[in-house]
């Protein structure tokens, strides 16, 4: 009898060990696959683009055509609404439209609200699926009291603190930036692009985060400088384009309404796909320029300028 009990115990132990080894092997296979997933947005001249299948999509690494390992409609979204605290206080008059945008998001969208100040992101509301709670975090920007900061360094800070649960192959990440784009911390004199722009773009690409930017002027006379504004809009336009999103501005004046911008961004977020490609990043990992096209009529695909291919074993 004791022998049978010992035999049964050994059997349970071996079965448990096999399950653990199988799970470990599966995890190793997944980690060493070298797959990279990134978000692609379908844009149509019509009100809503048609469903896009994997067969409709062409992916290239430079001039080399690549096979798409997986293509699926985006579901889970982590969306951070980041407001430059140096904005003119009249921006708060647009928050009714921003609240409508927040409340229109599907239940699967986790929303955070933060204010960019002192080269960091002051999180007013962490990621939550309670959209009413997120909407309540909106307040009047500080204006002149926040002049002297860099929205680019502030967003890098936010990306460094992005929740690990959001950085999965099955989740999308987006930032909705409302800013003049002016870097008051670094100032001018660095050529057309601010020194922290490229590090921000690379971090966003590595974390598969699209950065949608909406222009609103800063407080004070310095924020009306033609040179600063022209340079800033060049920077935020590149930021959005290189991270697979779009920038919204019409000249350098005070926008009448931000509602059309929020509505369009909402439509884009509802028409996103996750594209997975198998590609080795070598022993160190690397950034790879990509081009994504479709043969579907009247449809354009928006994708980041480059993606990060993880190193073997990541």
Residue ranges with predicted function:
Residues 11-22:
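Bacterial N-terminal signal peptides
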Residues 1-6:
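N-terminal secretory signal peptides that target proteins for export/translocation
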Residues 26-314:
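Scaffold/interface architecture of coatomer-like assemblies
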Residues 7-11, 56:
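Detector for intrinsically disordered, low-structure N-terminal pre-sequences
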